[in-house]
């Protein structure tokens, strides 16, 4: 029998009116917990609102140690336990005000320059800039690819003002922001933009593999008004990687099967994803090594697949993160087939793995100049190293960036190669540390991992028992 589902059609103007009448209420609480700041958000529910909130905190490089999320379908209530990167509570009044304004404005047009100017610290720009032209590049990864791309851009007079590059499962995705190296400002001339695209196409097709399709997409940002194709850079990278199918053959660890003992399960830091039906929802459990922005990446994957998070809880025990989501499809359905569940598992594993810190992390800080990215990546390539992930941006006269490097086969870098890179780049390198993907945190006492495994129960079911008390406390804000 065919199942027919009816959904009410809500006019966008009415939906906007509801948001204006009931804007998000954000409370920053430094009294309830001695070790972290509680950010409590109470707002009208809207598809994608959870990702918008997590994005604000992630862009500030705040550490989310725990979070509780609940929705009754029309109203959304969240509590985030956060600290700064050093494990301290948030006490800066300008930062607290910025968080309150940014979460509210995320539903009404985004963060303004005035809001950023009032914040007494730098916020890394993770959105399309209205002063530059953005190029998106995806395709097969190979050693030296970023070096080739940046060299071509330098040769044709394009100044890279910011760039983010990810590699995963032999795929590469990049978002590069350019300005005219001769005249400054965005590249406006259509002929000039076409020229840049042609050169990038040539680089990507230089090692073309039969059956593969590489893409170079120009996304233009207008100098005035709302940018065309406005997007958050890291969200866009997730979308690009997903579009490239990097999630195929991404398998989670199966060490929870009968073949593995409790000791191994307790120590395993690989990615585990389990999905089961629970009270009209699909319950998704994620367990993996903790790292910065893990919550952002998993929520981003769920949003990309058009799932709605109704309830969730996330936290960490030592170096292990555990997350549990109660989700439905955007159309109200749940995951009914094993094929649907397997696809979600693959996509979550891919989203978590894309940002995994592979190799040695080189942090640079130097003078902003034409061809800087080309110079740095050339030195890395000429010393037999490969870049697995990179992020660079300019702040006035200064350029800062981080580059994760391995040998050409993806193995650990040798000390001689690293010394050569540091020597050639000179004072530009401010640190070189092994990227272990761990977030700084104060370590509290935890029970033995085996005992934790024996006592393992659904953290979501524990959450249900606290949900009524949580809802009451938030509504009293």
Swiss-Prot record:
Tell me the tissue specificity. Expressed in flowers and siliques.
Q: Name one GO cellular component term.
A: nucleus
Annotated ranges, domain ACT: 38-124, 134-214, 283-358, 361-441
Alphabetized InterPro entries for the sequence: ACR1-12, ACT-like_dom_sf, ACT_dom
PROSITE patterns named in the record: ACT
Please, which domain of life does this record's source organism belong to? Eukaryota
Location of the motif Bipartite nuclear localization signal: 329-345
Keyword Repeat in the entry? The reply is yes
Record key words, sorted = Nucleus, Repeat
Intrachain S-S bonds: none
The record describes the protein's role as:
May bind amino acids.
Q: Which protein are we looking at?
A: ACT domain-containing protein ACR1
Q: Which organism is it from?
A: Arabidopsis thaliana (Mouse-ear cress)
């Amino acid at each position: 029998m065919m199942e027919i589902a009816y959904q009410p059609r809500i006019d966008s103007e009415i939906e906007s009116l509801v948001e204006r009448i009931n804007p998000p209420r954000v409370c920053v609480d430094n009294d309830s917990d001695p070790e972290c700041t509680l950010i409590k958000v109470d707002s009208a529910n809207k598809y994608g609102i959870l990702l918008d909130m997590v994005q604000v905190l992630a862009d500030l490089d705040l550490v989310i140690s725990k979070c509780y999320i609940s929705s009754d379908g029309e109203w959304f209530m969240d509590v985030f336990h956060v600290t700064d990167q050093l494990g301290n509570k948030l006490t800066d009044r300008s930062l607290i005000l910025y968080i309150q304004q940014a979460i509210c404005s995320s539903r009404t047009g985004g963060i303004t320059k005035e809001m950023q100017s009032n914040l007494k610290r730098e916020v890394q720009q993770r959105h399309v800039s209205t002063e530059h032209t953005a190029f998106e590049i995806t395709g097969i990864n190979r050693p030296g690819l970023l070096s080739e791309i940046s060299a071509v851009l330098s040769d044709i007079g394009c100044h890279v003002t910011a760039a983010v590059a990810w590699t995963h499962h032999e795929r590469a995705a990049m978002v590069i922001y350019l300005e005219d190296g001769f005249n400054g400002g965005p590249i406006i001339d259509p002929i000039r933009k076409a020229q840049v695209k042609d050169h990038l196409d040539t680089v990507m097709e230089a090692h073309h593999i039969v059956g593969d399709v590489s893409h170079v997409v120009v996304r233009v940002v207008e100098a005035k008004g709302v940018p065309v194709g406005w997007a958050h850079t890291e969200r866009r990278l997730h979308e690009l990687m997903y579009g490239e199918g990097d999630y195929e053959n991404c398998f989670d660890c199966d060490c929870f099967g009968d073949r593995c003992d409790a000791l191994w399960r307790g120590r395993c830091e690989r990615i585990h994803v389990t999905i089961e039906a629970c009270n009209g929802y699909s319950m998704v459990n994620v367990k993996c090594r903790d790292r910065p922005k893990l919550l952002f990446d998993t929520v981003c994957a769920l949003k990309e697949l058009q799932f709605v998070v109704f309830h969730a809880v996330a936290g960490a025990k030592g170096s292990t993160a555990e997350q549990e989501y109660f989700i439905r499809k955007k159309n109200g359905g749940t995951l009914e087939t094993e094929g649907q569940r397997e696809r979600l598992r693959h996509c979550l594993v891919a989203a978590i793995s894309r940002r995994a810190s592979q190799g040695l992390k080189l942090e640079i800080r130097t003078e902003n100049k034409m061809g800087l990215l080309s110079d740095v990546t050339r030195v890395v390539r000429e010393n037999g190293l490969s870049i697995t992930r990179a992020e660079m941006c300019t702040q006035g006269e200064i350029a800062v960036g981080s580059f994760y490097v391995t040998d050409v086969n993806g193995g650990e870098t040798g000390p001689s190669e690293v010394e050569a890179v540091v020597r050639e780049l000179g004072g530009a390198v401010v640190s070189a540390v092994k990227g272990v993907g761990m977030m700084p945190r104060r370590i509290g006492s935890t029970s033995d991992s085996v005992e934790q495994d024996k006592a393992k129960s659904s953290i979501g079911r524990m959450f249900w028992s606290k949900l009524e008390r949580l809802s009451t406390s938030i509504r009293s804000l």
